[in-house]
Amino acid sequence: MNMTATIQLKGKDFLTLADYSKEEIEYLLHLAVELKEKQQNGERYTPLSGKTLAMIFEKPSTRTRVSFEVGMVQLGGHALHLSSRDLQIGRGETIADTARVLSEYVDAIMIRTFEHEKVEELAHYATIPVINGLTDDDHPCQALADLLTIYEVKGKLQGLKLAYIGDGNNMAHALMLAAAKVGMHCAVASPKGYEPKEAVVKEAKQIANESGATIVVTNDPYEAIADADVVYTDVWASMGQEAEANERMHVFAPFQVNEALVQQAKQDFMFLHCLPAHRGEEVTEGVIDGVRSYIFQQAGNRLHAQKALLVSLL
């Protein structure tokens, strides 16, 4: 499908999938498939020659840094890594000034930080595209790669059921919004008190009403996973929650994705995890290393989904 003529994303920010239409998301996914094929065929494609992406990391990352940096290089551009040591954003210099200064030097900014408001403020003052590489509230780049992986394996998105089992964190938020946008049913199972934010659930349900999807939040993992096409989990204690790790281990134990739980999913279910994984905690080795697991294809798709983003926005 060639939708290049109809969809124009140049100069747009990528802060959350809620800001993108179903058609725009599908366009990015089809472009990612094309770019992945070019890469696999050894075809050089360098539309971003002479372009620079500034990557701001207030939270360290393996996949986000490597995939964005490699993606920019493969597209003919350059990526600049800025840690919180290099850039005292919002402390020494205001976010507004940082945004304006970087806009004079580079062609886009990718930021991975804690507060979602920081990304929104950066985007407000920057005159170049800003990409959300992760916040405490959202992880749209990962969700885009997840949609790509599901599409590759299942051949469609509309009407599938995704079950997310675990902490109602940024990943749960991103997946609910992503599923709602593309017409995929999403059931989230979290322990009491660890559910996704009510405002995000409400927003996802409103989007789902338009796309024909359903969004369900429950405290019962068996209810959520029933007849699921896609089973997804994440770590029980995210970065910054180390102090709560022991308590969370106890609370989340019944939410482990194990052989007994996945028997309730469809026989041809696919297992996804945004990684890093704690084997034996949120998921058993049998499931994560089993034949239904697509976690490395999923991790690889961060590169291709983000390349589609970069080509479209820059």
From Swiss-Prot:
Q: Which family does it belong to?
A: Belongs to the aspartate/ornithine carbamoyltransferase superfamily. OTCase family.
Keywords recorded for this protein, A-Z: Amino-acid biosynthesis, Arginine biosynthesis, Cytoplasm, Transferase
Q: Which GO terms describe its cellular component?
A: cytoplasm
Q: What is this protein called?
A: Ornithine carbamoyltransferase
Name the InterPro entries on file: Asp/Orn_carbamoyltranf_P-bd, Asp/Orn_carbamoylTrfase, Asp/Orn_carbamoylTrfase_sf, Asp_carbamoyltransf_Asp/Orn-bd, Orn/put_carbamltrans, OTCase_ArgI
Q: What is the lineage of its organism?
A: Bacteria, Bacillati, Bacillota, Bacilli, Bacillales
Q: What does this protein do?
A: Reversibly catalyzes the transfer of the carbamoyl group from carbamoyl phosphate (CP) to the N(epsilon) atom of ornithine (ORN) to produce L-citrulline.
Q: Where in the cell is it found?
A: Cytoplasm
What is the gene called?
Answer: argF
Which organism is this protein's natural source?
Answer: Anoxybacillus flavithermus (strain DSM 21510 / WK1)
Coiled-coil portions? none
Report if keyword Metal-binding is assigned.
no
* GO BP annotation list: arginine biosynthetic process via ornithine; citrulline biosynthetic process; L-arginine biosynthetic process
* Transferase in keyword set: yes
**Record-linked HAMAP family:** OTCase
EC numbers, comma separated: 2.1.3.3
**Enzymatic reactions:** carbamoyl phosphate + L-ornithine = L-citrulline + phosphate + H(+)
Positions with a binding annotation for L-ornithine: N170, D234, S238, M239
Q: What class of enzyme is it?
A: transferase
Q: From the UniProt record, give the pathway where this protein acts.
A: Amino-acid biosynthesis; L-arginine biosynthesis; L-arginine from L-ornithine and carbamoyl phosphate: step 1/3
Q: Which residues of the sequence carry a binding annotation for carbamoyl phosphate? A: S61, T62, R63, T64, Q88, R112, H139, P140, C141, Q142, C274, L275, R302
* Gene Ontology terms, MF aspect: amino acid binding; ornithine carbamoyltransferase activity
